[in-house]
Amino acid sequence: MPALILRVMTLLLLGSACAQAAQDSNADLYDPVAPANSAFVRVLNLSDSNVEVTLSGKNKPQSVTGGQFGGYRFVAPGVQRITVAGQVLEHELKANTASTVLYRDGQLQLIADQFVNEPRKAQIAFYNFTAKPAALKTLDGQHVVVDMLEHDQTGSRMVNELKIAFAAYAGDARLVDFDELFLKKGRSYSYALLPAGSGFRAITLANSIDPTE
């Protein structure tokens, strides 16, 4: 089962990252391949500025744009030291898991991502980083995709391959729309609901792996 989990997670996350690297004339001939029982971790930078992320076990830092997710990086399981803009978080990352480290107001918080062993489906992860409980629904609000989440919670759902857009709802109130994406089987996608002034904003992302060592 652990080998299956690793294979599925790699398929879900890798996506276009390898294809993009292969097209880059400066890319290394061989990209790193995640060893068995790896842990995966990324940063969501909710500051207004780009931040530098360092990770124990990795040689090069990662730059994460303000207001965006960074790519997942794979590391050996165990206690890892994650540094974002000078702030340090040490956390035990378990084998065959994925985590998102939230950088917000100068503080770090780790959120355990959810994965399902089903490469024949597309996986949706919904994050609610607002104070208002919210659910992910189809645009018309008729179908719930991920049930109501409280502040700083995440939930997931497996769906068939299709092109679709979603929206975040608080009850019957439509808060914000997410970009339309073609959800491909064997891939994973992140939908994040964030505060923006007196309203809300959305991040829609096809997840990827950053293979930088």
What are these regions (language model features)?
Residues 12-21:
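Hydrophobic h-region of N-terminal signal peptides that target proteins for export
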Residues 2-11:
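Sec-dependent signal peptide recognition
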